[in-house]
Design a protein with these regions (language model features):
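Intrinsic-disorder/low-complexity, polar/charged segments enriched in Ser/Thr/Lys/Arg/Asp/Glu/Gln
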Residues: 19, 31-33, 82, 94-96, ...
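Short, well-ordered amphipathic alpha-helical segments that serve as non-catalytic structural scaffolds
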Residues: 60-64, 124-125
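Hydrophobic beta-strand-centered segment that forms part of the acyl-chain substrate-binding groove
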Residues: 64-105
Length: 128
């Protein structure tokens, strides 16, 4: 799944991504980078709304796993169980969130668990 295909998928399946005007800059085995402009994600202080920053980070992490699973022939059913984010400073312009799929060991464990028909968990980080 390339960047254009992922962006189309997100806009069709996750309507919030279209409302936030996200653009997928890169998508591949190495990870995903998503850009969001300021205007549709602005708050009352003329900076990025914290919920928008969190949503774009989650989209990047979810997408990195989704792209990798599809590349491996796994039909993904991904659910975000927990999300935590630290806000270190206001974001005053369009911004990107970047995420990579799990490292080799975590990926191998995830695939093995899914192959046994069991629910699996994996931790994925995103950086805004």
């Amino acid at each position: 799944m390339n960047a254009a295909e992922l962006e189309r998928y997100l806009h069709e399946r996750i309507p919030l991504s279209r409302a936030m005007a996200i653009q997928v800059r890169t998508a591949g085995a190495g990870g995903v980078q998503i850009y969001a402009p300021l205007a549709p994600n602005i708050n009352h202080r003329d900076t990025v709304f914290g919920g928008s920053a969190s949503a774009v980070a989650m989209l990047a992490a979810w997408s990195a796993l989704h792209v990798r699973m599809r590349a491996e022939g796994i039909d993904p059913r991904i659910v975000i169980r927990r999300n935590a984010m630290s806000y270190e400073r206001p974001i005053t312009a369009g911004f990107t969130a970047t995420s990579a799929p799990p490292e080799h060991e975590a990926w191998t464990r995830l695939v093995a668990t899914l192959a046994r028909g069991r629910p699996a968990r994996v931790r994925i980080m995103a950086r805004v």
